[in-house]
Regions:
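ATP/NTP phosphate-donor binding region
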Residues: 1-83, 299
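A glycine/threonine-rich phosphate-anchoring loop and its flanking beta-alpha core
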Residues: 7, 102-186, 191, 272
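Short glycine/serine/threonine-rich phosphate/pyrophosphate-binding segments
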Residues: 16-19, 39-43, 67, 92-99, ...
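A short, small-residue-rich loop immediately preceding and capping a beta-strand
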Residues: 77-115
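Short alpha-helical scaffolding segments that buttress acidic/His motifs in well-ordered protein cores
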Residues: 168-172, 215-223, 255-258, 286, ...
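Active-site segments that bind and position negatively charged phosphate/pyrophosphate groups
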Residues: 178-285
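C-terminal charged capping/lid subdomain of soluble metabolic enzymes
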Residues: 276-347
Length: 347
């Protein structure tokens, strides 16, 4: 079964210059720009393409998508009487935009500058821990998403690498998702290939525009054509939410261990992933990518404490989620302890 959400995507160099056309298409006459605190100059450059439609700029987007930022953005939209908004950025700004759009039904255009892929999912959340609010709505999806590789060339390599591995996690888990289909399988494999190919080129030259385009294309494929996620996402999300580790880097750390654990139960998925990454041991290849990119390999490097492991096991074991290999609390403990230590995965 293949079901497509209605979402308009513009991909390619210079596509951001067409944002005025997109605003017109979606009947946005009073547009607010949403960005992070340090992206005011970028917002001004985008505003030039929107002309008189722009009624204001909100820099209320914050890392971690706190509830206070959500409230501030909603208030800004109301104060400006905006009938649409443009969100500039990656995971956190887009995440907040989705929650705001779901709550207000005000449409938005996403201008993507990282590889997180959040814009392709109708799931949203704000806050963390006991304060987290979450949901899923078609109104959380952007009316249009613009992927212009030129907007990613100034993203630092370390941030790019972590974001790409976050996207890689979407692709890998789609290869063994319970609702995968031939389209998802083919495009998830291609996503992994593009991402794996782009990273060493970006390390050599972060301004390599062809590598940037490959990474952005791979991230879009991984996010737009995905199956239900399993162990890797469950562990990474629970660790991030409960222990305050950074989102993309947490996904990058956990992915090789989840892939290695699931490999015996998902041989076809591992065959596809091996083709994409050019290795006989794809889980080790994922680990080696983290090492080559200078990313953390262990959760201990991200601020998690060894004393946190039992709680992490408890919260993961308490959730129901699909996974190709059966999971016991002992198995989850093994995965998390290996991911904490950061040595090459061994199962």
């Amino acid at each position: 079964v293949y079901k497509s959400d209605q979402l308009r995507v513009l991909f390619g160099r210079g596509t951001v210059e067409r944002i005025g056309e997109e605003a017109e298409r979606h009947k946005m006459s009073r547009v607010m720009l949403l960005c992070s605190q340090n992206r005011g100059d970028f917002a001004q450059s985008i505003a030039a393409h929107l002309g008189e439609r722009v009624v204001g700029i909100s820099n209320a987007a914050r890392p971690g998508m706190p509830g206070a930022a959500f409230d501030e953005i909603v208030a800004d939209l109301k104060r400006l009487s905006a009938d649409g908004f443009v969100c500039l950025g990656g995971g956190s700004p887009i995440g907040l935009a989705k929650a705001v759009a779901a709550a207000t039904r005000i449409p938005f255009i996403a201008v993507i500058t990282t590889y997180s892929g959040s814009e392709m999912s109708g799931r949203w959340y704000i806050g963390a821990g006991a304060d987290e609010r979450t949901g899923e709505s078609p109104h959380a999806l952007p009316a249009s998403a613009i992927y212009d590789p030129d907007l990613t060339v100034d993203l630092p390599f370390a941030t790019s690498a972590a974001s790409c591995m976050n996207a890689m996690a979407h692709a890998v888990e789609s290869l063994y998702g319970p609702d995968a289909n031939p389209i998802v399988l083919a495009l998830a494999e291609e996503a992994a290939r593009r991402l794996g190919s782009a990273l060493p080129r970006l390390k050599q030259n972060p301004k390599d525009i062809d590598a940037r385009a490959d990474a952005l294309y791979g991230a879009w494929l991984a996010a737009a054509f995905r199956a239900t996620t399993g162990l890797s996402h469950m562990v990474a999300q629970r660790v991030r939410q409960n222990f305050g580790t950074e989102h993309a880097r947490t996904h990058a750390v956990v992915l090789p261990y989840a892939a290695a654990f699931n490999a015996p139960a998902a041989p076809a998925a591992m065959e596809r992933l091996g083709r994409a990454l050019g290795g006989a041991d794809p889980a080790r290849a994922l680990y080696d990518i983290n090492v080559a990119c200078g990313l953390a390999t262990g959760l201990k490097d991200l601020g998690m404490r060894e004393a946190d492991i039992p709680r992490a096991v408890e919260v993961v074991a308490g959730r129901k989620f699909p996974n190709p290999r059966p999971l016991s609390p002992a198995a989850i403990d093994d995965v998390i302890r290996q991911a904490f230590a950061g040595q090459p995965p061994r199962f």
